[in-house]
């Protein structure tokens, strides 16, 4: 999934992080060099609290002029991410591969037996669903399908 493609659809990319603003001042330029940029990145620095509280999502909504939580999707790789999204009452999607919850490097994933990897992914999926995730995907490549599904639900009031 290319972020540029989402932007062409009018989707704004907001980010929340547990890192401090000083840390993000180092991380964001490096991420941009690798092709990842956000329209807004919110840290807990100037807010009452970070995750799992919803304040960083709400600050993104304010700064990006998004009027409704129905129009927000929280995508994350930790249980704290999932709880942040649920507490903000936004669509919440967990990701498994590359996640802190799975705790494996790409090389470890590639070297793991398919049966073991399937079992580990099922454990993470279950934890994310129990934390309240609306959807859980293996990778970001599945996100366009989830966005399409959510848009369909919003357009049909389901």
PLM regions and their residue ranges:
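Short, small-residue-biased leader/transition segments that mark boundaries at the very start
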Residues: 1-2
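Asp-based, Mg2+/Mn2+-dependent phosphohydrolase catalytic module
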Residues: 20-21, 25-158
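Conserved ATPase "switch" residues in P-loop NTPase domains
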Residues: 7
């Amino acid at each position: 999934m290319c972020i540029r493609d989402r932007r062409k659809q009018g989707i704004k990319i907001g980010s929340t992080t547990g890192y401090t603003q000083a840390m993000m001042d180092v991380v964001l330029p490096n991420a941009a060099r690798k092709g990842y940029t956000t329209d807004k990145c919110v840290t807990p620095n100037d807010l009452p609290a970070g995750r799992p509280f919803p304040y960083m999502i709400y600050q993104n909504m304010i700064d990006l002029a998004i009027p409704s939580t129905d129009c927000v999707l929280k995508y994350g790789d930790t249980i704290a991410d999932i709880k942040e999204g649920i507490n903000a009452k936004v669509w919440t999607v967990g990701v498994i591969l590359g996640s802190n919850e799975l705790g494996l490097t790409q090389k470890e994933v590639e070297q793991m037996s398919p049966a073991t990897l399937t079992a580990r992914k099922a454990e993470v999926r279950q934890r994310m669903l129990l934390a309240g995730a609306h959807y859980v995907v293996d990778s970001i490549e599945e996100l366009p399908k989830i966005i399409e599904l959510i848009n369909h639900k919003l357009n049909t009031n389901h």
